[in-house]
Each structure stands twice: as structure tokens, then as C-alpha cells.
Amino acid sequence: MKKMLLHELHPALVHMPLALLPTAAAADLISLTTRDGAWARVARRIWVVGSASALLAGVAGMAASQEVRLETPRARDMTFLHGVGNATVLLGALGVTAWRLRREPTSTTVALGLGACGLAVYSAALGGKMVYEIGVGRPGDVQANPTLLLSRNAPLVLVRDALRGALWLVSRARALLSGGHPLAPGAAGAEEGEAPTVPSPVQAFPGQERPMPQA
């Protein structure tokens, strides 16, 4: 059985905030519209757990950006947008959580929570494109001597690479805002006509009109 690598921690954790944060926002919306305090208490607890899981997934994602190979400008800039989106969602979630620990939900916090969830969906879509179209993080497409998740030095490497990833995001943002280094074509994931970097092999089966992808 293949041992889990450190950069694989991010995709393993990211499903928790993607499920918990929208649930918390929906519970706050129900509490606000029905004036039911039970929903507000449930939402408060979910915000705490969801924000904590988002923080862990974010740190793991920052580290992963330094542990995989980003060979093309499109891969690097899509990773950049994915990281910026996740960081924005995390800051929004932490802000709403800090408010909700002491106060009841308001229309403003509900709007912020729902907006953060919308951004999380877009960022998650970019993450899917990075893996299934560009092939980021595939076996053999990582940095030399990748760190095992359960190795003794994994915590130190995680913190070190997360800091490097954060510094890389800041430096790339500066280059983008200065106008000297625009985003690569296709980095935003919404351009029409962009072709997948990793083509999917297909195999036609008798009696079927459409080819079926190979496993």
C-alpha cells in the first residue's frame, strides 16, 4: 500500500470546510429568518469547527504549493488564484466566527458567510481543474524526495513550506497588481476553448453512442 505523502494532506482535509462552512451559513440564515435560537447555537458550533478545519486545510494547501511541480505558467497562476481564494474564504470564515462567538447572526454576517461559500465553490472548481486537467500533484509530478505524511520531520516541513507558500502568494500578488506579470491564459478556469493539459483516453464500446472514459 502506497504511503501518504505530505502534499496529499490538503485534498484529504479540504472536504471538511467545504461541507461545514455552507452548513453553518445555512443554519445562520434559518436562525435569522425564523428567529429560532436553537439554529443560532448549532450554527455557532459549526462555524468554530468549520473555521478550524479551513485553517488546517489552508496551511496544508500552502505547503502543498511548494511540494508539487508547477511546470507551466497556467499551472502556477491557477494555483495562485486557488490559494488566494482559499485565503479569502478562511479570513471571512474566521471573521464571521469571531462575531458569532459573542453575538447573534445578522443579515451582514449571513451575507458574508454565503459570499464566502460562493467563493469556496469557485476555488474548489479551480482545485479540480488543477488536478484533473493540468495534472498537478500526480505521482511522479512532485518535487524530488517528497516528505511522507507520518514521518518524523513532517510537522517541521509542513510549517516551513506553508510559510514559503504564503510568501509566494504575496510576491505573485505584488507582481500581478504592479501590472508587470499578468495572469497566464486559462488560469482563471473560465476561458472558452481552453484545452485540457492532460487528455483523457477514451474507448468506444459496442452498442453505445458515446465513448466511455477508460479507468
Segments and roles (model prediction):
Residues 1-215:
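Short amphipathic, positively biased membrane-proximal segments
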